[in-house]
Amino acid sequence: PRSRGLGDVYKRQVEGIRMFTEIPEEYLYKVYASEDFYNEHRVIFEHMDVELVSPQVMKEISDTMTPQGVLALVKMMKYSLEDLLEQEKPLFLVLENLQDPGNLGTILRTGEGAGINGVIMSHDTVDIYNPKVTRSTMGSIFRVPFVYVDDLLEVAETMKQKNIITYAAHLNGTDYTKEDYQKGTAFFIGNEGNGLTDKLTDKVQKKIKIPMCGKVESLNAAMASGLLVYEARRQRQGVD
């Protein structure tokens, strides 16, 4: 039987050289490496306590079918919603019930590129520490703040009170390029198949859409998120 890995409620498993070299040292809890990998890449393990394991053991503890030879347990990052919302003119992505690990990973990576201040997610969104998510972030998971919350309706209300303008990605919205994102901004993105729930859509201040040509009705969540945050970034460039 396949192993479920070594992670627990406080720590998560991260694999592969690319991801390993992205982990900030303060989050590293334990490092495992195969002897061959260790001998070949000694320089990346400087000043680290590394447990060497056989290829067989590495295969058993790995989440992938063909492990690269290095695996780390990392302490989970902890951020607070209150701290995130206190930032000046922040830019957020708010995700409701997103299920695809690749989508979430790409959203984090694209979000980092566009300079977002954080990702806020409903509890029924896919686990950000899912190995597929972690891998597809290419290290952004360690640099983009994120929180899971119980109630996105409450978050939308709090944002309104803090003068953060909330936007719902919605088929009945106005063209997203016609809005002004230079103030505090939060883009709400819904589940891949169903979009945002009606309740949350009604709570959010404005509806926006990405115009489509041909017979395409909508883009996937990751691509839509990317277009929205990069439009916000474009508008904010050169603005204090």
Where are each of the predicted segments found?
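Structured adenosyl-cofactor binding patch, chiefly the S-adenosyl-L-methionine
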Residues: G113-A114, I128, K132-I141, D198-D240
